[in-house]
C-alpha cells in the first residue's frame, strides 16, 4: 500500500489528495482529520451540502454506485487515496481503479467489495477463516427464507445482505412474523430483489465494537495492529443509540475479541481503522460484522481517546505513527431529528452544554427525518455509568425544530 514520502500543500500542484466517498458525519470528521495533516480533501456524496461537503476543500454530487461517474471523478481529481465512508458504492469499479494504479483504495478495494455485502464478509469470516459466528443461511426467495427460519429455529434475525444503519433488520419470533420480516428486509435493502441473511439468535451478554487499527510500526517500518479499548453500545431497530468506552470485559473475552479482530482485519489487509462488531457471551466471542472504516459507535472516541478514531484512520492511511491511548471513560448519545423537515433549527444547546464534561456535535445535515441521526452528545466522567447518564441528559436537552 502506497505511503507518501512527503505531504504536499493543499490547493497547490504538489498537494497530497484524498477523495472521500460518503460525506456524512463520519466522513466530515475524517475530512477534518486529514486536513489537520495538510491533506487536500475532495468530498463526494449523492446529495448536496452533506456534512463533509461543508468542510472539504472541494465537494461533488454524483451517484456513487455509477461506475462511469466514479471513474470520471477519479480521472479528474487524480487522488492519492480513495477513502470509502459508506457501503453503497461501485465497488467493482474501485477494484479496477486500484488494479490500474489510478489511486490507492483504503484499506483495499477487495475489503470495500467484501464488506458492502454481508454474504461476502460472513463467508470469509466463517467459512474461510473459521471464526465463531451464529448459525446462518442466505436466501433469495420467500420460500427459501421460510425454510431457513424453520431450520435455524426461533427467534432468529433477518437482514438484507446489503443495507446500513439497521435498515431492513428485524427479529423473527415465530412463523407468524415471517411475511412482515421479509417485506421489511426488502424495503430496507439497497437494491430490489436482494438476498437476505437469516441468523440464529445469539444469547449474548453484550455486544462491542473493537476499533482495530492497521498501520506502520515506526520502530520496525513494518505493518502492525493496534486495538482501542472496547466500546459497548446499545442498539435500537438495528441502529446505535448510545455507546461507551471502555466496556468492561473479562481478560479471556478481551483476548478472544482481539484475536478475532486481528484475524479478520489481517485477511482484509491495507491500513486504517476497522470497526469490528462482536457478540460476547461469558468468555466466548462471536464475530458479527466489520466495517473497513471508522464506526458510528466510535463517535465516543471524540471524547475518550488522545486521538479519535478519525485521526487514527488518517494517520494510519498516511503511514504515520498511531496512539490508541484512552484518556478518560466516556459515552456518546445520539440526537435524532424527531421531525421530517429541511433546514431545521436546534434549541437546548445551552442546557446540553451545561452538563458536566460534555460536548455536542451537530452534523449540519440539510434535512431532518424522525429517526435520522442529526448530532451526538459526548461526555466523560470517572466511570462509564456516569458518562452515559451525562450524554443521555445532554442529548435529550437538544430539540430539533422544522
From Swiss-Prot:
Xref: SUPFAM superfamilies: Glutathione synthetase ATP-binding domain-like, PreATP-grasp domain, Rudiment single hybrid motif
Function: Involved in the de novo purine biosynthesis. Catalyzes the transfer of formate to 5-phospho-ribosyl-glycinamide (GAR), producing 5-phospho-ribosyl-N-formylglycinamide (FGAR). Formate is provided by PurU via hydrolysis of 10-formyl-tetrahydrofolate.
One Pfam family this sequence matches: PurT_C
Protein name: Formate-dependent phosphoribosylglycinamide formyltransferase
HAMAP family, per the entry: PurT
One GO CC annotation: cytosol
Binding site for N(1)-(5-phospho-beta-D-ribosyl)glycinamide: 25-26, 85, 296, 365, 372-373
Organism superkingdom: Bacteria
Residues annotated as binding ATP: 118, 159, 164-169, 199-202, 207
RNA-binding as UniProt keyword: no
Domain ATP-grasp: 123-318
Assembly notes: Homodimer.
NCBIfam families: PRK09288.1, purT
Keywords: ATP-binding, Ligase, Magnesium, Metal-binding, Nucleotide-binding, Purine biosynthesis
Associated pathway: Purine metabolism; IMP biosynthesis via de novo pathway; N(2)-formyl-N(1)-(5-phospho-D-ribosyl)glycinamide from N(1)-(5-phospho-D-ribosyl)glycinamide (formate route): step 1/1
Broad class of enzyme this protein falls into: ligase
Similarity-based family: Belongs to the PurK/PurT family.
Reaction catalyzed: N(1)-(5-phospho-beta-D-ribosyl)glycinamide + formate + ATP = N(2)-formyl-N(1)-(5-phospho-beta-D-ribosyl)glycinamide + ADP + phosphate + H(+)
EC number annotated for this UniProt entry: 6.3.1.21
Gene3D superfamilies documented for this protein: 3.40.50.20, ATP-grasp fold, A domain, ATP-grasp fold, B domain
Amino acid at each position: 500500500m502506497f505511503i507518501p514520502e512527503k505531504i504536499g500543500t493543499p490547493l497547490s500542484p504538489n498537494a497530497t489528495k484524498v477523495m472521500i466517498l460518503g460525506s456524512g458525519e463520519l466522513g466530515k470528521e475524517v475530512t477534518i482529520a486529514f486536513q489537520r495533516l495538510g491533506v487536500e480533501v475532495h468530498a463526494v456524496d449523492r446529495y448536496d451540502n452533506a456534512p463533509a461537503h461543508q468542510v472539504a476543500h472541494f465537494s461533488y454530487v454524483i451517484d456513487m454506485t455509477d461506475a462511469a461517474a466514479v471513474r470520471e471523478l477519479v480521472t479528474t481529481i487524480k487522488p492519492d487515496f480513495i477513502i470509502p465512508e459508506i457501503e453503497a458504492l461501485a465497488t467493482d469499479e474501485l477494484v479496477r481503479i486500484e488494479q490500474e494504479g489510478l489511486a490507492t483504495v483504503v484499506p483495499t478495494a477487495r475489503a470495500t467489495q467484501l464488506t458492502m455485502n454481508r454474504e461476502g464478509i460472513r463467508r470469509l469470516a466463517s467459512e474461510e477463516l473459521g471464526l465463531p459466528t451464529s448459525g446462518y443461511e442466505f436466501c433469495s426467495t420467500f420460500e427459501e427464507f421460510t425454510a431457513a427460519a424453520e431450520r435455524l429455529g426461533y427467534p432468529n434475525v433477518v437482514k438484507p445482505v446489503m443495507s446500513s444503519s439497521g435498515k431492513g433488520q428485524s427479529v423473527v419470533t415465530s412463523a407468524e412474523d415471517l411475511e412482515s420480516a421479509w417485506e421489511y428486509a426488502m424495503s430496507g435493502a439497497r437494491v430490489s430483489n436482494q438476498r437476505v441473511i437469516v441468523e440464529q439468535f445469539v444469547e449474548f451478554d453484550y455486544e462491542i465494537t473493537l476499533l482495530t487499527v492497521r498501520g506502520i510500526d515506526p520502530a520496525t517500518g513494518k505493518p502492525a495492529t493496534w486495538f482501542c479499548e472496547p466500546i459497548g453500545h446499545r442498539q435500537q431497530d438495528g441502529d446505535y443509540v448510545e455507546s461507551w468506552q471502555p466496556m468492561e470485559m473479562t481478560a479471556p473475552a478481551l483476548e478472544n475479541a482481539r484475536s478475532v479482530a486481528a484475524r479478520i482485519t489481517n485477511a482484509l489487509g491495507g491500513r486504517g481503522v476497522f470497526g469490528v462488531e462482536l457478540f460476547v457471551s461469558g468468555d466466548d466471542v462471536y464475530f458479527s460484522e466489520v466495517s473497513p472504516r471508522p464506526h458510528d459507535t466510535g463517535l465516543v472516541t471524540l471524547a475518550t481517546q488522545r486521538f479519535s478514531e478519525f485521526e487514527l484512520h488518517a494517520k494510519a492511511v498516511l503511514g504515520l505513527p498511531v496512539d490508541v491511548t484512552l484518556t478518560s471513560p466516556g459515552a456518546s448519545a445520539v440526537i435524532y431529528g424527531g421531525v421530517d423537515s429541511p433546514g431545521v433549527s436546534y434549541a437546548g444547546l445551552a442546557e446540553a452544554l451545561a452538563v458536566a464534561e460534555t460536548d455536542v456535535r451537530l452534523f449540519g445535515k440539510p434535512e431532518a427525518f424522525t429517526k435520522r441521526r442529526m448530532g451526538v452528545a459526548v461526555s466523560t466522567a470517572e466511570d462509564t455509568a456516569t458518562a452515559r447518564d451525562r450524554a443521555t441528559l445532554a442529548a435529550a436537552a437538544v430539540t430539533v425544530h422544522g
